Amino acid sequence: MSLREEALHLHKVNQGKLESKSKVEVRNAKDLSLAYSPGVAEPCKDIHEDINKVYDYTMKGNMVAVVTDGTAVLGLGNIGPEAALPVMEGKAVLFKSFAGVDAFPIALNTNDVDKIVETVKLLEPTFGGVNLEDIAAPNCFIIEERLKKETNIPVFHDDQHGTAIVTVAGLVNALKLSGKSMSSIKVVANGAGAAGIAIIKLLHHYGVRDIVMCDSKGAIYEGRPNGMNDVKNEVAKFTNQDRKDGSLKDVIVDADVFIGVSVAGALTKEMVQSMAKDPIIFAMANPNPEIMPEDAREAGASVVGTGRSDFPNQVNNVLAFPGIFRGALDVRATHINEEMKIAAVEAIASLVSEDELSADYVIPAPFDKRVAPAVAKAVAKAAMETGVARITVDPEEVAEKTRKLTIIGE
């Protein structure tokens, strides 16, 4: 069978990828009296007296809503909520498989920002966290920022931050090979959508100061007269301080790092040759990268990462989001802040030892069982240190719990 035939068969024969499963058995009247009436009234009364006990007595503490409006699904674009549902189911499968997090798809039949925000807010009693997924820019930025302010559970747009965290982790290790520092490099990013914006924000937070971002109209700079929006205006305030104009070809000269989250073929061998010596290339357009790895290496690239599993250094969000939510849920975090994201970056990067580090191995493999426990531990610790954790736990216990819950490779 072809990939298409296999994929359709898997989804059809199982009627999707998720089901509801009870943690307790109801075999007799006693079981029924405990799981439902009259016994169920006891946790209800306790939660009514202390709302935080909802985490002790219900699924909330391990349940994430995977929310989409279907406007930016993979490489398929605006295909609507029903067509997005298989992706949301798949995301829930990854949450469970990689970190034991229960997740449920919520595909919303609206693109209205106010309606999406209000709907998610109304779901807060049920879910311990919210993963926003495949929502087009600029709505994705607005929705996330509003929900972070208007709810008290972690809200995380994975298309932005998951990609950013794994990319920066890869760059941390790639720079070890080059001997360069974050504060000294020039970075050119191509693609000003959700992932691109989040990557340069995290890089700036990490100490990178020489950043130029390009979109389809060329270099973004403060005061550019066309093709701007609120998010690009915000980015322009801390990037491209020399206000360079022109195309990607013009601004990439002497850059140390290229980060692409744009379209296939956007980066040419000639552009790579115009960069600084031994440039680092992260070409993450899917299904085909901005430049093929062999072409980038022929042009002088020292390290090349893509979004594909058939090339070395795959930038895969599954290295980030399961462990991030595991750590956040286990401390009952109210938010996922910058410190927690940076902790995730450091945890992922640290799993590649100095002995293992090479041009073809700067990012752990997606099925490396060490990743989710390490990320969960680091994120939980950072949450407690920055005051967004509701409870105190031993970070090592979080790691051990994650190891036991992870079912990949079994």
Swiss-Prot record:
Its cofactor is Mg(2+); Mn(2+). The keyword Manganese applies. Induction: Transcribed at a high level under all of the conditions tested. SUPFAM superfamilies: Aminoacid dehydrogenase-like, N-terminal domain, NAD(P)-binding Rossmann-fold domains. Disruption phenotype: Mutant shows wild-type growth on glucose but a much slower growth rate on malate, fumarate, or succinate plus glutamate. Overexpression of the other three malic enzymes, mleA, maeA or malS cannot compensate for the ytsJ deletion. The ATP concentrations in the mutant grown in minimal medium with glucose are similar to the wild-type level. ATP concentrations decrease by about 20% in malate minimal medium. NADPH overproduction is virtually abolished in the deletion mutant. NADP(+) binds at A192, G193, A194, A195, N286, N317. The keyword Disulfide bond does not apply. Its EC number is 1.1.1.40, 4.1.1.101. Keywords: Lyase, Magnesium, Manganese, Metal-binding, NADP, Oxidoreductase. NADPH is a strong modulator that switches activity from a pyruvate-producing malic enzyme to a lactate-generating malolactic enzyme. It catalyses: (S)-malate + NADP(+) = pyruvate + CO2 + NADPH; oxaloacetate + H(+) = pyruvate + CO2; (S)-malate + H(+) = (S)-lactate + CO2. Coiled coil: none annotated. GO terms for molecular function: malate dehydrogenase (decarboxylating) (NADP+) activity; malolactic enzyme activity; metal ion binding; NAD binding; oxaloacetate decarboxylase activity. It comes from the Bacteria. Divalent metal cations. Belongs to the malic enzymes family. This is Bifunctional malic/malolactic enzyme. The lineage of its organism: Bacteria, Bacillati, Bacillota, Bacilli, Bacillales. The gene is ytsJ.
